[in-house]
A protein has these predicted regions:
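Secretory targeting and sorting signals
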Residues: 1-32
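A short beta-strand motif characteristic of beta-propeller blades
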Residues: 30-34, 39, 68-74, 110-116, ...
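Repeated scaffold domains used in trafficking and secretory/extracellular systems
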Residues: 36-44, 77-85, 119-130, 166-187, ...
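Conserved beta-strand positions in repeat-built beta-propeller and related beta-rich domains
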Residues: 44-45, 51-56, 85, 92-97, ...
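Enriched for extracellular/lumenal, surface-exposed ectodomains of secreted and cell-surface proteins
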Residues: 46, 129-130, 315-316, 410-431, ...
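Structural motif
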Residues: 58-61, 99-102, 142-152, 200-209, ...
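Blade-level signature of beta-propeller repeat domains, shared across WD40, Kelch, NHL, RCC1
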Residues: 305-342
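Proline-enriched interdomain boundary motifs that mark the N-terminal boundary
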Residues: 339-348, 440-448, 537-552
C-alpha cells in the first residue's frame, strides 16, 4: 500500500450509536496537527494533503506536507479508518459509531454522501479497489464472524438500488470476530489484502488476498487458524504476489496458500511505499520508526520516535508519523526517510605543539556503505581563521576509515570538523574534535609593586610586554581595596616601540593593579599584578590655646594650666573608621607615652577630642592622630601617622 496506514486500536466492546450526524467543516490555521486518538491516516499525493481520523473528537483533519493543519470536518461519529478512491476524487471515512461510510470531497472536506451500513459493529476498516469501496464489519459480542462489504459509488440510491452490499467475504468459518484490516496497492489493481486476529482469542487469525475486480470477490489465497505471527496489520506489497503480515513477515502467495519468504525485526504497524520501501513501527515498548529498503531486513534508517502510525507519501519523498505526546498524537514529517545517516568519528590528539605536524583519524559508518572514493571535507577553525579554513579533502578508505595530517600554525583551541556532503543514498553528516595547541608564554611586567604613596597621588603604572606575534595590546586594570569599588579598566592600548604602555592610577586606597595581555595565535594570554599602597589624608587642628611660641626650636601651643585643649582631627573617611589618638608627656629629658585611644570618625571625617588640663604649670605634652591598617576599623589604606602637635601648660 502506497498511500495509507491503519491502526488496530480495538473498540469492539463499545455499544455504537446510530444517531444522525451534524457535519461541521472548519478551516485550520498553520499549526501542528495533534489528534486525541487515531485509527487511520491516508496521504493524498495529488493535493499534498495528509488526512487523519481523530476518533476522540469525531473529526477528520487535513494537514499539508509540512505537517500544518489546513482543514477539518467534525461530526464523523466514531471515525475509524480512511481511504482515498482509486482516482483520488473522494475520501472515505468509516464511522463506526453511526454505522456508515461517509464520502468527503478531499479538496474541501465537504460531505458528498453517506452510506448506512446495517452492521452490529463497524464499519471499521475501509479501502478502495476494483472500482468499489470495501469495508469490514462485525456483529456485537462475537455472535458472527467479521465480514466484507462494498459500496458501488456508481449506483444512485435514488434509483431504488442499494449501493451497499454485505456478506461478500468469500472465506467462511474463519473464526475471527473482529472486523478485518484491509489494504490495496495501485500496482496490483483489483486485489485486497485482508488480515486480523480475533479480539477474544488471539490464536484465531486470518490472512487472505481477495480478487475484487470481478462481479463477486474471489479468494486468491488464505490462511486461517493461526499464522506464525500475530496479524495486527496487513500490507499488500507492490509489484508482486506478496503481503506483509503483522508488520513483520513477508508472505508470497500462490496456488491459494501463503509461504513465508522473509522477515523483519518484530513490529506492530507498517506501511509500504509504491517503490517497496517499508516503514515499520516497533513493538510495544519500542515505538521507533525503522525504514527498510526492498528485499533488505536491516533498517536503512531509524527514528527514535514514540510512534503509533506511519504513512508514506506516494512518491516516497516523505514519511508521516503520528507521535505520542502529552496532548495526544502529533503529526511528524520525516523527510528523506530512505537515506542512510552516516556517523562520523573524529579523533584528534588532545594536545599538540604549534607548528608541528599532527594526525587526525576517524571512521565513517552507515547502514549503506559510502560509494568508493567518497571524500570528506575538512575544516580547521582556530584563532587566525575563526570562520574556518578549508583543508585538502580526505578520501574514505574501503573500510570506512580516514586520516590526514596537518600542521597547525595557530595555538590555542583548534577545531577539526569533518563533513560528508551526502549523496543519492546518504544524508549529510558532520563531526568534530578539538586540540589544545601550545602557545609560548610572553614576557609581561608591571612596575611600582609594594610602593606607598600619599593619598590621592596620581601614579603612572607602566607595563612592559616582550615579544609577541600580532597582538601588541595591553590593558591596565585597577582594583581598589574595599568591596564598594569594583575592579575597572583604566586604559587599553598598544605598547610603544620599547614595549611599554602606561596608565595613571588615582591612589586613594591600597590598590591591586593588573596588566593584561589577551594573547594571540602564537602567545598565550598572561596577566601580572602588583599592589601599591595609599596613605590616608590626616590633619589636626588645635584650639583654646592663648598663644603659640617656641621652646627651643619646637613650636608649642600655650594653654593656661586649667584650660582643656580641644583637638579636632580630620581624616579620610571610610565607614567604621577610627583614628588612634596618641598622647605623650615630657619628663626626665624624654617623651613618654601616656595613653593611646581610638575615636570614631564622623561621616565628615572629623574626630574631636577634649584633653583634660593638668592643673599645674610647666607641663609639656604632645599628641598625634594615626590611621592603623586593620586596627582603625578597616584595611583599605596603609598606616599613616599624623604630625605631632606640641602643648605647653603655664600659669
Amino acid at each position: 500500500m502506497g498511500t495509507r496506514s491503519i491502526s488496530i486500536a480495538t473498540a469492539l466492546a463499545v455499544v455504537f450509536s446510530s444517531a444522525a450526524l451534524t457535519v461541521v467543516v472548519t478551516a485550520g490555521s498553520a499549526s501542528a496537527v495533534t489528534v486525541g486518538s487515531s485509527w487511520g491516516m491516508v496521504v493524498d499525493g495529488a493535493r499534498h494533503r495528509v488526512f487523519i481520523g481523530d476518533d476522540t473528537r469525531d473529526k477528520v483533519v487535513a494537514a499539508d506536507y509540512n505537517g500544518n493543519l489546513v482543514d477539518s470536518v467534525s461530526g464523523i461519529d466514531g471515525v475509524a479508518d480512511l481511504a482515498l478512491s482509486e482516482d483520488g476524487s473522494t475520501l472515505y471515512a468509516a464511522a463506526r459509531a453511526s454505522h456508515e461510510i461517509v464520502a468527503l470531497d478531499p479538496a474541501t472536506l465537504d460531505v458528498k454522501a453517506r452510506y448506512p451500513v446495517a452492521a452490529g459493529s463497524g464499519p471499521l476498516y475501509v479501502e478502495a479497489a476494483g472500482g468499489k469501496v470495501w469495508f469490514t464489519y462485525g456483529e456485537w459480542g462475537g455472535e458472527t464472524e467479521s465480514d466484507l462489504g462494498s459500496i458501488d459509488p456508481a449506483v444512485d440510491p435514488a434509483s431504488g438500488t442499494d449501493p451497499v452490499s454485505l456478506g461478500q467475504f468469500p472465506l467462511h468459518d474463519h473464526g475471527v470476530t473482529g472486523p478485518a484490516i484491509l489494504d490495496a496497492d495501485p500496482s496490483t489493481p483489483g486485489l485486497l489484502a485482508v488480515g486480523q486476529r480475533d479480539f477474544y482469542d488471539s490464536a484465531k487469525q486470518l490472512l487472505a488476498v481477495v480478487d475484487v475486480s470481478g462481479p463477486a470477490p474471489r479468494l486468491v489465497a488464505s490462511q486461517s487458524g493461526g499464522p506464525t505471527v500475530y496479524v495486527n496489520d496487513v500490507d499488500l506489497l507492490p509489484g508482486g504476489s506478496a503481503v506483509l503480515g503483522g508488520a513483520t513477515k513477508r508472505y508470497a502467495y500462490a496456488d491459494g496458500a501463503f509461504t513465508e519468504t522473509a522477515s523483519y525485526p518484530y513490529g506492530q504497524r507498517a506501511d509500504v511505499a509504491p517503490n517497496g520501501l517499508v516503514a515499520q513501527v516497533g513493538p510495544v515498548g519500542d515505538y521507533r520508526v525503522s525504514v527498510y529498503r526492498p528485499g533488505e531486513s536491516k533498517a536503512v534508517r531509524t527514528y527514535a520516535l514514540d510512534a503509533s502510525q506511519v504513512a508514506w507519501a506516494p512518491d516516497a519523498s516523505r514519511l508521516f508519523a503520528l507521535v505520542s505526546g502529552p496532548g495526544g498524537d502529533t503529526l511528524r514529517v520525516l523527510t528523506n526517510p530512505a537515506l542512510s545517516v552516516p556517523a562520523i568519528t573524529v579523533n584528534a590528539p588532545s594536545t599538540a605543539t604549534r607548528a608541528k605536524p599532527l594526525t587526525v583519524s576517524g571512521k565513517v559508518t552507515a547502514t549503506v556503505k559510502l560509494p568508493a572514493g567518497a571524500q570528506l571535507k575538512v575544516t580547521r577553525t582556530d584563532m587566525e581563521y575563526p570562520n574556518g579554513k578549508t583543508l585538502p579533502a580526505v578520501t574514505v578508505k574501503a573500510d570506512g576509515t580516514y586520516s590526514f595530517c596537518d600542521t597547525p600554525s595557530s595555538g590555542g583551541t583548534v577545531t577539526y570538523q569533518v563533513s560528508y556532503a551526502g549523496d543519492a543514498e546518504h544524508t549529510p553528516a558532520s563531526a568534530y574534535d578539538k586540540v589544545a595547541v601550545s602557545r609560548a608564554t610572553p614576557s609581561l611586567s608591571l612596575n611600582n609593586n609594594g610602593k606607598v604613596y600619599a593619598y590621592g597621588a596620581d601614579v603612572p603604572f607602566t607595563a612592559h610586554l616582550g615579544s609577541t606575534y600580532k597582538n601588541r595590546t595591553v590593558e591596565i586594570w585597577a582594583d581598589p581595596f574595599g568591596s564598594d569599588r569594583p575592579k575597572k579598566l583604566i586604559k587599553s592600548g598598544t605598547v610603544n616601540s620599547h614595549g611599554n604602555f602606561s596608565a595613571v592610577v588615582d591612589m586613594a586606597r591600597d590598590t591591586t593593579v593588573y596588566a593584561v595581555f589577551k594573547g594571540d595565535s602564537h602567545y598565550k594570554p598572561r596577566t601580572v599584578k602588583v599592589t601599591a599602597y595609599a596613605k590616608v589624608r590626616v590633619s589636626t587642628a588645635v584650639s583654646r590655646h592663648y598663644k603659640t611660641g617656641k621652646i627651643g626650636s619646637t613650636t608649642y601651643y600655650w594653654f593656661h594650666k586649667r584650660t582643656n585643649p580641644l583637638l579636632t582631627t580630620t581624616m579620610t573617611y571610610y565607614p567604621g573608621r577610627h583614628q588612634r589618638f596618641d598622647l605623650q608627656a615630657y619628663y626626665q629629658g624624654s617623651w613618654h607615652s601616656l595613653d593611646s585611644q581610638y575615636f570614631a570618625l564622623g561621616t565628615n571625617g572629623k574626630s574631636v577630642v577634649e584633653l583634660g588640663a593638668p592643673g599645674e604649670a610647666g607641663v609639656k605634652a604632645r599628641m598625634r592622630s594615626v590611621y592603623v591598617n586593620g586596627s582603625s576599623g578597616d584595611s583599605v589604606n596603609s598606616t599613616t601617622y599624623g604630625g605631632w602637635k606640641y602643648l605647653y601648660f603655664s600659669n
